[in-house]
Amino acid sequence: MSKEPSSVALVTGANRGIGFEVCRQLASRGFVVLVTARDEAKAKTAARKLANAGAVEPVLLDVADPSSIKNAQSEIATKYGLLDVLVNNAGINYDTWETAENADIGGVMETITTNLLGPWRLCQAFLPLLRKSKAARIVNVSSESGSLAHMGVGPPAYQVTKAALNALTRTLAGELRHAHILVNAVCPGWVATDMGGAGAPRSVEEGAAGVVWAATLPQNGLTGGFFRDGKPLPW
């Protein structure tokens, strides 16, 4: 009997922090994990560090560059023919000390390009490959900062783009429900990463676990939701 092929997962922003740990956890579960970064050397370094966890492969991918997305999609389509899991993890937060009133619009546009249009373009590019999977999953790494129920004063471009990412999640989940592709947003919580800072209360392992949970939901699993640690959050 031939061995069932391993499921293929792509993780953006995977060279450090939550993305790196998501790759480690997925690889340890038997996935072939495509470790992406916008710097090819960093993707290769991350893949080397993850080699003991399982099957990993570095892929050059800049979510803010449409040509980079196209090249990565072509490479993956040629080598694997499908994609089972897409984790949109890459994101930026450059406006921590700004307000909506005085925000630099150039920085806002950069944040929109990475945090919203990046995942949107990735979904558009990889949906043909995800449709070939028997159990495809899309996980958008969001933040409670993007919850309208909890939103207040905070980094304006970051939280507005995360709210928009949540809206994209709901839209895609509705469109893809009958295609058996589950689409969810996950808040990893305040995690001790380069972005979250050393004083954050949650470990990278804890933050990544909720993302991996959504990436490995069963066929009849939830879709169109916003979760932390597998529990619903308000939009």
Region spans (language model):
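Rossmann-fold scaffold of SDR-type NAD(P)-dependent oxidoreductases
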Residues: T12, L83-G91, N115, N140, ...
